[in-house]
Amino acid sequence: MKRMLSGIKPTGRVTLGNYIGAIKPFVSYQDEYEMIVFVANLHSMTIYQEPKDLSDVLEHAQLGWYLGCMVSMGELSRMTQYKDKASKLKKDESIGAGIFNYPSLMNADILIYDPDYVPVGEDQKQHCELARDIAERFNNRYSETFKLPEPLVPKVGGRIMDLQNPTKKMSKSDETGKGCIYILDDINVSKKKIMSAVTDSDNAIYYDVKNKPGISNLLTIYSILSGESIDALVERYQGVGYGQFKKDLAEVVGNELQKIHDKYNEINQGNYIDTILNEGADKARYMARKKLAKVERKIGITIKK
């Protein structure tokens, strides 16, 4: 069975975009792949966090250092996340080294488990491609060690956009919260956000990301949550106004969120989540230690007895 790996940062509240683009697909992927999903808590330290346990699998950080020695400053400075942060800096602000070196740790997160595929949004594809480059560079220098992972970009739903500004991605860091649906928020509030989502003035429902980004984004959300294709939705809503379309979509979103709330409340009882995390950490730690030991033998830093 092929192996798939993905991680989620534990910062901010989970959005509908996170759910559609990453969490929901994990459920279907686990039937087809050996899934490894981790909480990227070391990545969260690029912004201040309350002190707590650093990580269950510290081997990520160790491998991140080794791989960081094989990546150039030019490669790191070309990463979209760094460029985006740099472009938004105010005069008295600076970027921490953690943001600049972020891709090195991401390379380690990926390569330490030898995945065949890494599901990513279009905006994260660059990071997976860098991981492939570094893996190939390491393999050429020290002999075959890492698999070259393939980025898996979903055709639909990989990038859910802001409801108030559909030219930018729905983000946990949305300052107003008006364009972002948080999956554990009050369901009626989320429905109202769908009803007030920005569209356009021609009141025609069809998919055209360039000219109709708002309605195209809503069609994507509707399609993913209902299981109905975008083409089928467009045909069904021919001659129907945006108001009815949004009302129907709000019900679909509300029903999906209700299922999430029910499941969340069910598994949030007792020690169920801690048990799953601990069992997963034990398995991941074994795999990571094995790979790290192999890397250290290759680069010659193991202590000879």
Question: Language-model features: where?
Answer:
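Short, histidine-centered active-site or binding-site loop motifs used for metal coordination
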Residues: 8-10, 41-43, 116-117, 174, ...
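Conserved aromatic-histidine-acidic binding/catalytic patches
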Residues: 49, 119-122, 206, 237
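Conserved nucleotide- and phosphate/pyrophosphate-binding catalytic cores
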Residues: 16-18, 126, 132-305
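N-terminal Rossmann-like or analogous alpha/beta NTP/dinucleotide-binding catalytic cores
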Residues: 2-108, 252, 257, 261, ...
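Short, Lys/Arg-enriched, disordered terminal segments
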Residues: 1-2, 305
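A conserved hydrophobic position in a structured secondary element of the catalytic/binding core
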Residues: 40, 113, 185
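Classical nucleotidyltransferase
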Residues: 63-65, 78-84, 91-166
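Short helix-capping/linker segments at secondary-structure and domain boundaries
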Residues: 73-77, 112-119, 224-233
